[in-house]
C-alpha cells in the first residue's frame, strides 16, 4: 500500500511539474498556433469563438484573448473590424492613442491594432455594457487563405501591453511554418 501511494504521489508531482512547460496547440482558419506559456486556456464563452485564453496579472486581474474565424469574405474586412474594435471604447478613436501597423509575414498580411482607454465590456451587439477604465487592446487580423483570423486581447492596460510580444511571436511562428 505504501509503495502504491508513493508511486501515485510521484506521478502526480511529475504531471503537475510538466503542466507549466507544455504548450497547447490549436488552429483557427487553417492556421496552427501554439499558445504562449503565460496564457491559460479557457472554454470559449460563445460558439463564435474558436479559442479563448486568460492572461493573469500579478495583482489577480486578468486580460482575455479571443480568436475568431468566420470564413472567406466574412466579418466585414480589416478596416471594419478595426473600427468596430476601437468603437468598443467609451472615448472616441482619436483619444485612444490607437495605432495600426501592417506587416507581411511569409506572404501573409497581418494588421496589428493597439489602443488604451475605457473599454465597454459586455455583449458585442446590444446589452448592458460596463465601463472598464485603464483598459488596453492588442489585436491581430491575419488575412489567411481560408479567410481572416481575428485575435483580440482586452483587459488591464499593463497586462495587455505585456502580452503584445507574446502575441506577435505566436503569430509569426504560426505563419512561418
Which stretches of residues belong to each language-model region?
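Signature of long, low-cysteine stretches enriched in small and polar/charged residues
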Residues: 37, 41, 45-50, 82-142
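Solvent-exposed coil/turn segments that connect beta secondary-structure elements
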Residues: 58, 70-72, 116-120, 146, ...
Amino acid at each position: 500500500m505504501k509503495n502504491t501511494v508513493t508511486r501515485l504521489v510521484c506521478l502526480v508531482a511529475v504531471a503537475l511539474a510538466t503542466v507549466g512547460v507544455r504548450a497547447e496547440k490549436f488552429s483557427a482558419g487553417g492556421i496552427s498556433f501554439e499558445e504562449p506559456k503565460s496564457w491559460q486556456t479557457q472554454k470559449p464563452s460563445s460558439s463564435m469563438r474558436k479559442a479563448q485564453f486568460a492572461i493573469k496579472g500579478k495583482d489577480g486581474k486578468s486580460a482575455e484573448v479571443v480568436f475568431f474565424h468566420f470564413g472567406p469574405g466574412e466579418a466585414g474586412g480589416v478596416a471594419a473590424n478595426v473600427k468596430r474594435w476601437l468603437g468598443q471604447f467609451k472615448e472616441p478613436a482619436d483619444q485612444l492613442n490607437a495605432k495600426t501597423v501592417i506587416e507581411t509575414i511569409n506572404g501573409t498580411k497581418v494588421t496589428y491594432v493597439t489602443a488604451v482607454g475605457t473599454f465597454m465590456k459586455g455583449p458585442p451587439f446590444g446589452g448592458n455594457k460596463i465601463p472598464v477604465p485603464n483598459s488596453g487592446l492588442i489585436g491581430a487580423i491575419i488575412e489567411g487563405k481560408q479567410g481572416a483570423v481575428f485575435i483580440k486581447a482586452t483587459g488591464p492596460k499593463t497586462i495587455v501591453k505585456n502580452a503584445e510580444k507574446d502575441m506577435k511571436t505566436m503569430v509569426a511562428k504560426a505563419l512561418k511554418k
